[in-house]
């Protein structure tokens, strides 16, 4: 690994993508900016899961959560406090070039998983986020803690598209009809049972942290208005929402009578309907593991909605947030997650793209920066703020590998952008990884520093 030079708080220029001509300079706190913190010292020994071995609480054989004083922790199966330093989409692309590179360098998927999990451990990571190659991970003689994502709404969405002709006339960026989640449809319940029941295969595995259900479901602020004004009056969703509205406002109430208080109350009912369905099936098939939520992501909608977080706290063990549009997490915003829900949170997506990567970087929600070194500074700045909050129990960088830019079958928002820790051919970005390692190797000491212990 390269030696990381000592630097204090710095300025880093960033922009949304290469189509934005101007750059903005952001204050960026690095590890070396922590006054009095001894950067040369690393964390004490970790247990096999990556937990803080020097401290012990009740061991249940599975991952759980616990608040100790004013700080939240994940507690690993051996009873040690654990911060989930993870990587999303720990998997290999499907293009011919990527598969050839896999065979040349690792021979098999199992060989790749063994080698790259060891690489991640050397970098101070201790877990794997959504969309990872779970089958290969579980076959390893030395696996890493991992997560599983099941997608009942995502699967039902495909059927719903076919039902309404394959293309919606009005839809948001996730391509949901009228930007509404179909939580009230009786057909959705069938997909909940089919998809969520799959968790039974993992219920006894101590290496599993927990489950996500779906990703970035649209929870628009005016969902009540849209249900009552855009849906046909014989649709199950309209009938369910009209019944709720009548009970709240009276049968003579009209959509024009909707207030912001009504919208907030409905958003709670709307989310509760989804979460009550998925968690009932989840707990039936696996009572042992954590429920990590449905990956909230919209600042103008659910991430500022107190009523929705209050509901989330009743069902989720940890609130998952895909965190974009903020260079540094806003301390009031992220502590509100815990204040409103009574639960800790985890950042399940965040990243920057380096314009020195030879990729166009025209898509994706993460920031563009000039260099891989600056990607590493962003990582330190972002994670330091999360650790200081005391209510964040981990983060998952998005993602392990750049897509092959020649593979036209990949998701458009990922295709041409430098989101990975390694290139499409497994070649690492050392300047980024060195700075990730510098923070990851000192996480528990950083927590002691922030907690004044």
Each language-model region and where it sits:
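Bacterial Sec-dependent N-terminal signal peptides
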Residues: 1-9
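Active-site-adjacent substrate/metal-binding segments within catalytic domains
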Residues: 13-149, 155-210, 256-270, 276-277, ...
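Polysaccharide-binding and catalytic clefts of secreted carbohydrate-active enzymes
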Residues: 77, 174-186, 194, 204-307
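Structural preference for beta-strand elements that scaffold enzyme active sites
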Residues: 127, 143-147, 207-212, 288-292, ...
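Aromatic- and acidic-residue-enriched segments that line the glycan-binding/catalytic groove
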Residues: 139-172, 205-209, 213-251, 405-421
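Substrate-binding cleft of secreted/luminal carbohydrate-active enzymes
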Residues: 208-210, 214-215, 350, 364-419
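Aromatic-rich peripheral "rim/lid" segments of glycoside hydrolase catalytic domains that contact
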Residues: 228-239, 398-453
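Glycoside hydrolase catalytic-domain groove-lining segments
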Residues: 256, 265-280, 284-364, 384
């Amino acid at each position: 690994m390269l030696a990381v030079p000592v630097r204090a708080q710095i300025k880093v220029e960033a922009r949304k993508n290469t189509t934005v001509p101007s750059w903005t300079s952001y204050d960026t706190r690095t590890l070396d900016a922590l006054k009095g913190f001894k950067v040369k010292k690393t964390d004490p020994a970790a247990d096999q899961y990556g937990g803080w071995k020097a401290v012990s609480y009740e061991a249940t054989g599975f991952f759980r959560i616990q608040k100790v004083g004013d700080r939240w922790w994940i507690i690993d199966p051996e009873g040690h406090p654990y911060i989930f330093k993870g990587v999303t989409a720990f998997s290999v692309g499907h293009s011919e070039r990527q598969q050839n590179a896999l065979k040349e360098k690792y021979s098999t998927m199992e060989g790749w998983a063994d080698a790259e999990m060891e690489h991640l451990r050397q970098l101070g990571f201790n877990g794997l986020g959504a969309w990872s190659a779970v089958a290969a991970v579980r076959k390893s003689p030395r696996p890493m803690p991992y997560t599983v994502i099941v997608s009942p709404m995502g699967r039902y969405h495909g059927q719903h598209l076919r039902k309404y002709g394959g293309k919606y006339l009005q839809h948001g960026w996730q391509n949901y009809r009228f930007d509404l989640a179909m939580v009230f449809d009786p057909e959705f319940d069938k997909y909940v049972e089919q998809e969520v029941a799959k968790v039974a295969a993992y219920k006894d595995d101590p290496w599993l942290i927990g489950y996500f259900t779906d990703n970035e479901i649209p929870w628009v602020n005016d969902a009540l208005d849209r249900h009552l004004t855009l849906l046909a009056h014989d649709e199950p969703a309209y009938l369910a929402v009209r019944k709720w509205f009548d009970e709240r406002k009276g049968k003579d109430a009209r959509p024009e009578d909707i207030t912001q208080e009504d919208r907030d109350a409905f958003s709670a009912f709307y989310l509760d309907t989804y979460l009550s369905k998925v968690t009932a099936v989840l707990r039936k098939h696996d009572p042992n593991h954590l429920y990590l939520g449905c990956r909230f992501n919209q600042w103008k909608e659910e991430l500022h909605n107190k009523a929705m977080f209050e509901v989330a706290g009743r069902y989720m063990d940890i609130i998952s947030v895909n965190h974009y549009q903020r260079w540094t997490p806003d301390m009031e915003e992220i502590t509100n997650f815990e204040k409103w829900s009574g639960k800790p949170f985890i950042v399940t997506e965040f990243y920057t793209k380096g314009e020195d990567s030879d990729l166009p970087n025209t898509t994706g929600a993460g920031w563009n920066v000039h260099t891989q070194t600056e990607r590493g500074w962003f990582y330190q700045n972002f994670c330091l703020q999360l650790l200081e909050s005391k209510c964040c129990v981990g983060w998952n960088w998005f993602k392990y590998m750049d897509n092959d830019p020649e593979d036209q079958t990949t998701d458009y928002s990922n295709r041409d952008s430098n989101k990975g820790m390694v290139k499409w051919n497994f070649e690492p970005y050392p300047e980024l990884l060195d700075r990730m390692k510098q923070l990851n190797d000192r996480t528990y000491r950083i927590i002691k520093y922030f907690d004044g212990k």
